[in-house]
């Protein structure tokens, strides 16, 4: 029998997640953190390619968060909320560093050994 986290990670793998973490943050709030690959070419160098890539990744992230949110609710958690690629409610970078997704770069971007800064972060919080 799969545990909830195993099931979540299986869904994440299906949705092309490259980095994932499960952590307890404050009190009884848990956090599942995900990173999806997205080329970090600057916008002005190839605006249309970058925009297309970001929108494609955003679609994958939304599908991933939706499927995983259902699994978490099915496991009895009542309060579940998500933060996607375009979330304006909070900065996920400190959580990404805490989850060992990478280290802070000089310009405030998280850099991973394998992927560099070529990823976008999303999260699900639940209690």
Where are these regions (language model features)?
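Auxiliary alpha/beta "docking" domains used to position bulky ligands
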Residues: 1-127
């Amino acid at each position: 029998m799969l545990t909830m986290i195993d099931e979540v990670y299986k869904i994440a793998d299906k949705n092309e997640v490259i980095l994932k973490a499960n952590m307890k943050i404050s009190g009884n709030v848990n956090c599942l953190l995900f990173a999806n690959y997205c080329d970090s070419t600057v916008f002005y160098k190839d605006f249309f390619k970058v925009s297309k890539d970001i929108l494609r990744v955003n679609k994958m992230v939304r599908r991933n968060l939706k499927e995983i949110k259902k699994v978490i609710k099915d496991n009895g958690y009542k309060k579940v909320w998500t933060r996607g690629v375009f979330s304006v409610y909070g900065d996920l970078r400190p959580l990404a560093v805490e989850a060992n997704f990478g280290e802070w770069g000089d310009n405030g971007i998280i850099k991973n050994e394998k992927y560099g800064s070529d990823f976008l972060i999303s999260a699900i919080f639940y209690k």
